[in-house]
Each structure stands twice: as C-alpha cells, then as structure tokens.
Amino acid sequence: GVRAWASQKAVELICRHSPWFGLQGVDVDGLRRRRGWEGAEPHVVASSHLLNRVHRHSRLVSEGLLVIADDHHLREDSRTAYHRMRSRAVQGLSDGKLHHLLDTMYFGPSNQSRLLQAVDVLTYFEQRRRHVTERHRDAVRRMNAIGRSLNKIRQHSYVWTP
C-alpha cells in the first residue's frame, strides 16, 4: 500500500545522502557470564564498541565528528563512558583514545531531531528485515528494495559474544 511505498521512498531518500550506518550488539547472557563484566550495562558496552568503530571511520575526517544519540535512561552512564574513552584507551571497549570525536555526546528526543528520526527509520527497517518474515508478496518486494538500500550504506554489523 501507500505506507509501504512511502517507507521505501523515505529509506531511499536517507540513503541517498550516504550516511555511515552501523549496528553493534552484545550477547547479554555471555556478558553476564564473563568474569569482570557481570555488572556492565549491555547498552553502554554496545554503544562503546560502536563509538570505537565510528572513531576508526572518523580518522578520515580532519575536523572530527559530532556524536548525537537518541535519549535513553542510561545517557549519563553513556556520557561517562564516552568521556573516559576520549581521554584514554579502555580495555575491551576501545583501541585507543577517541580523540577524533568531538568532546561532548549530545542526547535528544528523536521526535525533535530529523537526524535521529532518520536513524530510527533505518534501524527500524534493518531490525524488521532481520526478525520479521513478510508474508504478503508486495511486502516482500518492498522489504527487498529497502534491504538493497540499507546494504549500500551499512558499514558495520556485529554482535560481540564475550
């Protein structure tokens, strides 16, 4: 229908701007079993790994990168981890200091930021194509088209299994 068409067009429009799109996860059960990591927040671990990956990419950008994230309940823990990672290498989380990323990590509600809304759209469809089996022929066709667009921009997709 019209919503599927509009969704496909929205993804194509976002992808036309060639954003760096990456997904990072963590095996929560494995994290809980790993000695020394039992109390680690999975969200903070995954976002730290992703920030490390973004930093590797940012070395190509001389003026540095601004990090904007969707507001969430662990924002202060994430901000603390971010500052720690900018000042020194953190074992298990970063290759070295994240000095190419600008000094502050900004959090905001996605309903007030077109950038965060764009990330939400891409993330929603990436998760949907991984976890939902489409049954309707037209939905399969639309999701395949959306998937092709996502494949062009997705540069990182990994689940860390401690």
Question: Model-found features: residue ranges?
Answer:
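Phosphate-ester processing/binding pockets and catalytic centers
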Residues: 1-162
